[in-house]
Amino acid sequence: MEHFDASLSTYFRALLGPRDTRVKGWFLLDNYIPTFVCSAIYLLIVWLGPKYMKNRQPFSCRGILVVYNLGLTLLSLYMFYELVTGVWEGKYNFFCQGTRSAGESDMKVIRVLWWYYFSKLIEFMDTFFFILRKNNHQITVLHVYHHATMLNIWWFVMNWVPCGHSYFGATLNSFIHVLMYSYYGLSSVPSMRPYLWWKKYITQGQLVQFVLTIIQTSCGVIWPCSFPLGWLYFQIGYMISLIALFTNFYIQTYNKKGASRRKEHLKGHQNGSMTAVNGHTNNFASLENSVTSRKQRKD
C-alpha cells in the first residue's frame, strides 16, 4: 500500500506539480487513498442500499434529520462568514487572486476550505437518508454525480490550490447550503411543510451560483495572475456540467409539473362544464316527463 501511495504521489506531482506544503499533515490530505475509498464505498451503498431496503419498511429518521440539517446549516453559515471575512481582510482581488499573496488571511481561507472539503464527506449522509427513508426517486444522476465528485475534486484543490481564486465557488455554495439545509431541516417537521414555498428558488439559486462562478473563474483566465490556469479551465468545465444537469432537473421537476397541473386543471374545467350540461339536459328531460305525467293525469 505504501508503494502504491508513493507511486500515486509521484504521478500527481508529474501531472500537477508540487503540492502546497501548508496543508502537509492535515487530516485526510496527505494520502488520496482514503478519499477515493470513501467515494467508492459511497457509490457501493448507492447501488446496494435500495436493494437492501426493497422489502423493508422505511425509517422515519425525523429526529436525526432535524439535528443533521441544523448542523450542516450552522457549518455552512460558519464557512460563509469566515470565507467572506478572510477574503475581505486579505484584500482578495475579484478578477484573479494567487495562492501566496495574502499571508495570514490565506491561512484563514485554507483552514475554512478544509472544513468545506470535509463537509463534502459529511454530505454523503444526504443520500444515505434517502435510502433509509426509501426516497429513491431523489437519488438522481445529478445527486450522485455531484456528491461523488465534489469530495474528490476538493481533495486536489486543497493539496494544490487551497486558497486564492479557489474561494469564490465555495463561498457561494456555503451560502446556498445555508438556505438548502435549513429548508431540509424544516421539511422534516410535517407541520412546517405547508409554509415551505422556496424550494424552487433554491434550485434557481444553485444555477445562478454556477453562472457566477464561471464568470468569476473566466476573469482569472482573461486577466491572469499567479493562480494556475489549468485549474481555472477545469472549474469552468465542471460548472458547465452542473449547469446542464441542474437545468435538466429544473425542467423535469418544475416545468413539467406546471404543465401537468395546467392540463389537469383544464381537464377538470371541461369535466365541470360537461357535468353542468348534463345536469341541464337531465333537468330539462325531467321537466318534460313531469309535464307529460301531469297531462296524462289530466286526461
From Swiss-Prot:
Its main location: endoplasmic reticulum. The keyword Transmembrane applies. The gene is Elovl5. One of its GO terms (biological process) is alpha-linolenic acid metabolic process. Changing residue 220 to A: No effect on fatty acid elongase activity. It is a multi-pass membrane protein. Its EC number is 2.3.1.199. It is found in: Endoplasmic reticulum membrane; Cell projection, Dendrite. The keyword Acetylation applies. InterPro entries: ELO_fam, ELOVL5. GO terms for cellular component: dendrite; dendritic tree; endoplasmic reticulum; endoplasmic reticulum membrane; neuronal cell body. Interacts with TECR. It comes from Rattus norvegicus (Rat). The lineage of its organism: Eukaryota, Metazoa, Chordata, Craniata, Vertebrata. The chain crosses the membrane at residues 26-46, 64-84, 112-132, 139-158, 168-187, 205-225, 227-247. This is Very long chain fatty acid elongase 5. The modification N-acetylmethionine is found at residue 1. Changing residue 218 to L: No effect on fatty acid elongase activity. GO terms for molecular function: fatty acid elongase activity. HAMAP family: VLCF_elongase_5. Changing residue 233 to I: No effect on fatty acid elongase activity. Catalyzes the first and rate-limiting reaction of the four reactions that constitute the long-chain fatty acids elongation cycle. This endoplasmic reticulum-bound enzymatic process allows the addition of 2 carbons to the chain of long- and very long-chain fatty acids (VLCFAs) per cycle. Condensing enzyme that acts specifically toward polyunsaturated acyl-CoA with the higher activity toward C18:3(n-6) acyl-CoA. Belongs to the ELO family. ELOVL5 subfamily. Pathway: Lipid metabolism; polyunsaturated fatty acid biosynthesis. Highly expressed in lung and brain. Pfam families: ELO (PF01151).
